[in-house]
Regions:
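Short beta-strand/loop motif that positions the catalytic acidic residue
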Residues: 223, 229-231
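Conserved HGGG/HGGXW glycine-rich cap/lid loop of the alpha/beta-hydrolase fold
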Residues: 5-65, 69
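Conserved alpha/beta-hydrolase catalytic His-Asp/Glu region
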Residues: 154-205, 209-210, 219
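Conserved hydrolase catalytic core segment
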Residues: 90-133
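Conserved alpha/beta-hydrolase "acid-adjacent" motif
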Residues: 236-241
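Catalytic active-site module of serine/aspartate enzymes centered on a nucleophile-bearing elbow/loop
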Residues: 252-282
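Flexible "cap/lid" loop of the alpha/beta hydrolase fold
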Residues: 118-158
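Active-site loop/oxyanion-hole signature of alpha/beta-hydrolase fold enzymes
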Residues: 53-99, 274
Length: 282
C-alpha cells in the first residue's frame, strides 16, 4: 500500500493505492465524504487490481484551500486527469459511486480515450431533473422515527454547535439507513467526518449553479468506453432513469444487484464483486 499527497491544481490531494494489476480509480460519493467508506469492503478487489483511492478537493484528508473559481464540475474532472498523469497511467479503469458517478461521467465525456472501462455504481442521475425526482422518491423510505430525529437535529441548531461532528454523522447515517435494502446493514458503513466539516460544506456550496441545472444525457453518446451501470434492487433509480441512462450510453449494460440498495459492495458483496470482475475482465 502507498499513500501520500500530490499537488493537484495547486492544492494538496490525498491518495492511497493498494493491490497490484490493472489500475482502478475509485471516485467516492458525497459531496464532502471521502474514500474511507469503501473500506474495508473494496480490499477484496485489491487482490486483482491496483485500487487508486483519493479524497476529492476539499474532502477528507485533502486540503480545503481551493481556488473558488475552479470549484465546479470541470475542476473535479481536471483533478482526475492530473492524478492520472502524475501516477503515470496511459489509461484508467474508472469506478464512480453516487456523486462520484456524476464526476466519472463528466470525466469520460471529456477524456474517453483515457478510460479503459467505466463503472457507474449507484450513480447520481445524468440530469438535475432526474436527480431531484430520485431524491423525492428516496425520501419516502425514511421511517417516521428516523424522520423525527432528523427534524430535531436540523431544527435545534445541533449542526451549528461547537460539537457538531457526532450530529452530522448521525444525520448522514440516518439518511443512508433509508437507502439500504436491509436497514441493519447501516452498521457496516464507516463514515469519517472531519472536524472542519462545516467549512468544507461551505466550499461545496459553490457547486450550486452546476448542480441546479446540469443535463449530461446528450453528451453521454461521447462515451465509447465499455460502461457498466450498476444499481441496487431497492434504489428508486431502477424504476426512474436507469434504463434511460443505459440507453444513452452507446457501449453499456445495466445490472441490478439483488438484495442491496445504495451500497451493494456492503449488502451483497458476492454479487457486486462478481459483476465488477466480470466486467473489467471482458
Amino acid at each position: 500500500m502507498e499513500e501520500g499527497y500530490m499537488i493537484v491544481n495547486g492544492s494538496d490531494v490525498y491518495y492511497k493505492t493498494m493491490g497490484e494489476g490493472e489500475p482502478l480509480l475509485v471516485i467516492h460519493g458525497g459531496p464532502v465524504l471521502d474514500h474511507s467508506y469503501f473500506l474495508p469492503h473494496f480490499e477484496r478487489l485489491a487482490k486483482d487490481y491496483q485500487l487508486i483511492f483519493y479524497d476529492q478537493r476539499a474532502c477528507g484528508k485533502s486540503s480545503i484551500e481551493i481556488d473558488s473559481a475552479t470549484m465546479n464540475l470541470a475542476g473535479f474532472v481536471d483533478d482526475i486527469e492530473q492524478i492520472r498523469q502524475k501516477l503515470g497511467h496511459e489509461k484508467l479503469n474508472v469506478y464512480g459511486h453516487s456523486w462520484g458517478g456524476l464526476i466519472a461521467m463528466k470525466y469520460a465525456i471529456a477524456y474517453d480515450d483515457k478510460v479503459d472501462h467505466l463503472i457507474l455504481s449507484n450513480s447520481m442521475a445524468p440530469s438535475a431533473v432526474d436527480w431531484q425526482k430520485e431524491n423525492l422518491e428516496a425520501a419516502k423510505n425514511i421511517n417516521a422515527a428516523d424522520q423525527r430525529r432528523l427534524d430535531v437535529i436540523v431544527s435545534t441548531g445541533l449542526l451549528r454547535s461547537a460539537n457538531a461532528v457526532p450530529y452530522i454523522k448521525e444525520m448522514m447515517l440516518l439518511s443512508f439507513k433509508s437507502q439500504m435494502f436491509d436497514a441493519r446493514n447501516i452498521n457496516k458503513l464507516n463514515l469519517f467526518i472531519p472536524e472542519d466539516f462545516q467549512q468544507r460544506s461551505a466550499v461545496f456550496g459553490l457547486l450550486g449553479p452546476d448542480l441546479g441545472t446540469y443535463d449530461l444525457y446528450a453528451d453521454l453518446s461521447k462515451i465509447k468506453s465499455p460502461t457498466l451501470v450498476l444499481f441496487g434492487q431497492s434504489e428508486a433509480a431502477v424504476n426512474l432513469h436507469a434504463q434511460k441512462m443505459t440507453k444513452a450510453l452507446p457501449n453499456s449494460r445495466l445490472e441490478v444487484i439483488k438484495n442491496s440498495g445504495h451500497f451493494p459492495f456492503i449488502e451483497n458483496p458476492t454479487e457486486f464483486d462478481k459483476s465488477v470482475r466480470s466486467f473489467l475482465n471482458q
